[in-house]
Amino acid sequence: MYYGFDVGGTKIEFGAFNEQLERVATERVATPTDDYAKLVETIAGLVHKYDAQFGVEGTVGLGIPGMEDADNGCVLTVNVPAAKGKPLRADLETKLGRAVKVENDANCFALSEAWDDELKEAASVMGLILGTGFGGGLVYEGKVFSGRNHVAGEIGHMRLPIDAWFHLGEKAPLLGCGCGNKGCMDNYLSGRGFELLYEHYYGEKKKAIDIITAQKEGESKAVEHVERFMELLAICFANIFTANDPHVVVLGGGLSNYDLIYEEMPKRVPKHLLSVAKCPKIVKAKHGDSGGVRGAAFLNIK
């Protein structure tokens, strides 16, 4: 039995999956955001509860909005203050008497999609999230690749490539990022970035959904903005694909529901790739909000 936990800022979602990778149990509880001991006890309590229910010791995987320090195993996170700087994995392993795996939630999203029936034969899958932020995860041969420092796939904190700056023109905004740097892709390619760029060029705030609606209706500023954004996305995608060369790319997050992306990227990306390279297949995520739990559980698939 595979147990997965999606540990968020307000709730913890638990899921149990059988050997056929079918979900057989679900539970949601509030996240003890400021009480570390209670956080550990809450997770361990759910594990013990479902061990008893299923009569087996399930494997345990956690997806968190952050990552582990590669050297000391302590958690680096903002959204779950109780876990910040704490050895969450080690403490859970001591309490449960079994191995526990912890991964960034974007990596869990990518792993969930990589184990979908239609994609599980793909040698490599890249998950990209176009949501409040822009991030991703890498899966090779069914396993998350997180790198030496657990930051592989943190593409939101790569800076815009030079051709993207040329595309945005002399008035391109140099946006600051929460990581301390400027010009990170996170602030340009996310749903939030889609809105920030519109505000920068046209001097008015609009929600992404309203901009998209206006574009579909032919409103000139929205049409121009979407054209600019699609080319920006293609340039950045091409740089990312050149570095990682994935077989399949899965898009998640709110902006991934914009169907025009799937029409435009296969046409626009190739001209920014090496001449020998082909644009990978780009598809919409199938598992939505359940992806974090699925991916966390599937961290333990051998």
UniProtKB/Swiss-Prot annotation:
Annotated metabolic or biological route of this protein: Cell wall biogenesis; peptidoglycan recycling
Any Pfam family matching the protein: ROK
InterPro entries associated with the record: ATPase_NBD, N-acetyl-D-glucosamine_kinase, ROK, ROK_cs
UniProt keyword list: ATP-binding, Carbohydrate metabolism, Kinase, Metal-binding, Nucleotide-binding, Transferase, Zinc
Catalytic activity line of the entry: N-acetyl-D-glucosamine + ATP = N-acetyl-D-glucosamine 6-phosphate + ADP + H(+)
Binding residues for Zn(2+): H157, C177, C179, C184
Coiled-coil annotated spans: none
Protein residues bound to ATP: 4-11, 133-140
Family: Belongs to the ROK (NagC/XylR) family. NagK subfamily.
Descriptive protein name: N-acetyl-D-glucosamine kinase
Organism encoding this protein: Vibrio cholerae serotype O1 (strain ATCC 39315 / El Tor Inaba N16961)
